[in-house]
Amino acid sequence: MPFDLQGKKGLVVGIANEHSIAWGCARAFRSAGAELAVTWLNDKARPFVEPLAHELHAPIQMPLDVEQNGQMEAVFDAIGDRWGRLDFLLHSIAFAPTADLHGRVTDSSREGFARAMDISCHSFARMARLAEPLMKGGGSLLAMSYLGAEEVISNYGLMGPVKAALESSVRYLASELGPQGIRVNAISPGPLATRAASGIQHFDQLLADAAQRAPLRRLVSIDDVGALSTFMASDASRSMTGSTLYVDAGFHI
């Protein structure tokens, strides 16, 4: 039975194109009846994201570069002005400088480490803070993670420690926001051929290995991630918080 998001309002951050995990989630949210706010990174990304936002009939479409002062606040102000509330949020953004992603964590630069943490982890805490007053009746905050948070993944470099910090932040945010009825969870998909993943060296081999290693002997799709995300945004998951949930055909075991 499909999960019902009728009447719910959600923010989706991280759509880059039609291959994005965030797009698979947004499409599933919309199919379940949610009304969405959608963001794009910058003017270069806008032509790829705006047609998808139109397809979703998103009434709020705005730029959001978490490194730019004021842009995040402007998005949440627009949500407050139009809807007066927010029911769920999906954070699906991550970045590390190429040298730090491909090199050893031992050799990572101070600046690269700090920037990766700011964009990929601290931005989720900032969104949680801005979402809190809009979730007076409770809500669901979701962050995309990856197995590299807990296992060493070749060529994942600096993103491993950063995703570990993100998953830890999920637990702390869940503890802090739980009394307000706000649930916070991470979703950890298996390897997917997305734009973000294309920056990982030898990623094609990682995909092939994942399909062989996973007990179900296959890769997952953005639609698989969208289905789990819709469940986690819905009231059906009302007793679930502080968890990292895997949708990876069993790859993590």
Where on the chain are the PLM-derived regions?
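C-terminal substrate-recognition "lid" of short-chain dehydrogenase/reductases
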Residues: 4, 84, 134, 218-247, ...
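Conserved mid-core segment of classical short-chain dehydrogenase/reductases
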Residues: 53, 62-73, 77-82, 91-114, ...
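Short, small/polar-rich loop/turn modules that mediate ligand/substrate recognition or access, typified
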Residues: 178, 183, 240-242
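Canonical Rossmann dinucleotide-binding motif of NAD(H)/NADP(H)-dependent dehydrogenases/reductases
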Residues: 2-38
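A glycine/serine/threonine-rich, flexible loop-to-helix segment
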Residues: 1, 50, 158, 179, ...
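A short hydrophobic alpha-helix cap/turn motif
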Residues: 30, 84, 135-136, 175-180, ...
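Conserved SDR Rossmann-fold cofactor-binding beta-strand/turn motif
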Residues: 183-193, 233, 246-248
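Catalytic loop of short-chain dehydrogenase/reductase
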Residues: 14-21, 94-129, 137-179, 191-193, ...
